[in-house]
């Protein structure tokens, strides 16, 4: 399994590959050596950050909290954005979410100028202290594992406000 920036929470670049004992044994048995850890990899500072980050994730139960508490809370709040007239669909797994912007709910129609609505929303969001990414007319969010319920409420309230502004702008 490959992994990357999440192992350091993005503070420093690091990536890697994890293999099972079965896989590593097959490599060692056939090749005699499992070659890894070259001079251009395994940077000590990045590895130290990864070790500390993993310790914090474990000590503060952030993965369990995301799965059992804040994730479901955010998913429920995020789903409420589907009540907005320009939101066709929301979806979320864990803390990664997307929201599709459409000119008319329950219609297969899309905005004529693809990505204008997305960028309009994104610009309103950034100007109001909310960082989200526009991918065409889909808005993507991925808040940190340490987000609180109060911050989730603020995120969704600001998203709704930005949807209102976007709707107003797109209907001019």
Language model features with spans:
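Conserved N-terminal phosphate-binding loop of PLP-dependent enzymes in the Aspartate aminotransferase
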Residues: 1-172
């Amino acid at each position: 399994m490959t992994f990357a920036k999440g192992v350091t929470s993005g503070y420093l670049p690091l990536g890697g590959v994890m293999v099972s004992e079965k896989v590593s044994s097959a490599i060692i048995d056939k090749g005699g050596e499992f070659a890894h850890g070259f001079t251009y990899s395994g940077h000590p500072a990045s590895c130290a950050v990864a070790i500390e980050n993993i310790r914090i994730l474990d000590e503060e139960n952030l993965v369990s909290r995301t799965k059992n508490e804040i994730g479901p809370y955010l998913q429920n709040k995020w789903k409420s954005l589907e009540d907005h007239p320009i939101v066709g669909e929301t979806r979320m797994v864990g803390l990664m979410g997307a929201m599709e912007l459409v000119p008319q709910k329950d219609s297969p129609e899309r905005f004529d100028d693809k990505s204008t609505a997305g960028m309009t929303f994104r610009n309103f969001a950034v100007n109001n202290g909310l960082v989200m990414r526009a991918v065409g007319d889909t808005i993507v969010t991925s808040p940190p594992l340490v987000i609180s319920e109060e911050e989730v409420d603020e995120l969704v309230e600001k998203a709704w406000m930005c949807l209102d502004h976007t709707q107003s702008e797109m209907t001019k």
